[in-house]
Amino acid sequence: MLFQVVLISGMQWGDEGKGKLVSLLSKDFDLVARYNGGHNSGHELFLDGVKYKLHLLPCGCLYPNTVNVLGNGVVVHLESLINEIDNLTKLGVDLTNRLFISERAHLVFDLHIAVDAQLENEQGEHSTSIGTTKRGIGPTNSTKCKRTGIQIGEMLNWDNFEKLLSKLTYKLCHENKVFTNSDTRDLLNKQLEQHKVNFSKIADSVVDTSYMIQKYIKEGKKVFFEGANGSLLDLALGTYPYVTSSNTTTSGVYNGLGINPNVKILKVGVLKAYQTRVGKGPFPTELFDENFNKLQKFGAEFGVTTGRVRRCGWLDLVAAKYVQNFSGFDLINLSKLDILSQFDEIKLCTHYKHKLTGKLLEEGRYPSCCYQYDEYEPVYKTMPGWKTDISKFKTFEELPQNAQNYVLFIEEYLGVFIYWIGTGRDVNSMIVRT
C-alpha cells in the first residue's frame, strides 16, 4: 500500500476483524498507533499458526521493525498492560524500545472496575444495565470528564501521583459507597504498591506521543492508526445508551492521537459479512433460529475479552450506510466471508420499513433513539449461497459467482470499493483486489 498514513475503523458494533487487517498491513509501516478504548476491546489473531490475544496493545507489536503507540485517547489499566506484554514475551515477541504510551492517557484503576461492576449489577436488577465488559472503562472516562481522573504522565512525579490517587480513591468510594473507610485505605495502599512496581517497567516508554507521531509523519515515515470497538458503539453517534464511552469513529483519531486534521489519511472501514453484537442494545437483523447457531458456531463468535456468546444476524446495510455517511471510508475490508459458505441462502437488510405506515426510512438515515427501533422492521434481499470452501482462494475471480455477486451488491449499495476480502481465520487468508 503506497499511502503514507492509513486509518482502520470498524463499521459495526466491534468484532469486525480489524485486528487481522491491521496485522496484515502493519508489517509494512514504521509506526502503529491505537487512538481509543482500553482493555475492554480484544483482537484474536492467527499468524503462522500461532494464536495471539491482544487487548490494549496495537497489532503492530507482532512485527519486530514496527513501533507501537498507545495514544492519549486510550485508557490504560497498567496491570493488564504489563500482563499482556509478559504474555507476548513468552511467545517470543520483544517490545523493547517498540512501545510508547502517551503521557496524557488516563489510568484505569481497580476502583474504576469495582464501580463499573456495581453499576451494572444495580442496573441489572431493574433490567436497565448496558451490558458493559465491566473493565472500568466507563467510570474512567467519567472521571476524565469530571477532571478528577489521572493521566499516566502524573506517575513521573510520584509524590504528586500519591496525592492525586488518594483524592480520587476517597472521592469514588464516597460517591459510590463501594468500600468502607478501612477497605478504602487498604485499596489505596495496594494500588500505590502495585503501580510503583508496574510503572517501573514501562516508565521510559511514557512520552509525548502526539509530538512523536507528527514527527514521523513530517519525516515521511509510514504511519498506521488503529481504532478499537466499532462505529455503532460511538458515544455520540452509536446506538445510545448501548455504546462505549469513547469516540470510536474515524473523527476520533484526531483527538485520540493529537493529529493535525490537515494530515491526509486513507480511511479503511472493516465490515463483517454478517452482523454481531456483544451485550445489550438494538439489533434489527438479529437471528434466533438455526441460522444463528451456524453463524455463532462456524464464526466462533465469542467475545475475546469477556468470552460471552455474541449475538448474530444478517448483514445490516442500513446501519453500514449510516456509518459510511459520517465516516467517509475510502476502501472497505469485507471480513469473514468464508463463514457464509455454510448457507444455501443469505439475506441482507437493505431498508427499514415502518410497521404502521409501511414507509421506508430514507437511505443513509438511522434511528436516533432506542424506542425507534421497535417502530421499524428490516426489509431483506435474499441471495443464493455458494456452499464452497473459499479459504484457499487468492483472487476475486476464483470465488464462486454467487460469492462475487454478494460482494458486488454490498459494494454498489455502499458506494465504496471492497479492496480486501477475508476468506479464513489466518492473517494471510485474504483476497486483495486491484
Swiss-Prot record:
A Gene Ontology MF term for this entry?
Answer: GTP binding
* Binding residues annotated for Mg(2+), in chain numbering: 15, 42
Q: Where in the cell is it found?
A: Cytoplasm
Tell me the residue numbers annotated for binding substrate.
304-310
Q: How is the cofactor bound?
A: Binds 1 Mg(2+) ion per subunit.
Q: Which residues form a coiled coil?
A: none
What's its job? Plays an important role in the salvage pathway for purine nucleotide biosynthesis. Catalyzes the first committed step in the biosynthesis of AMP from IMP.
Q: Which NCBIfam families match?
A: PRK01117.1, purA
Family, as annotated = Belongs to the adenylosuccinate synthetase family.
- What is the name listed in the Swiss-Prot or TrEMBL entry for this protein? Adenylosuccinate synthetase
- The organism named in the record is Theileria parva
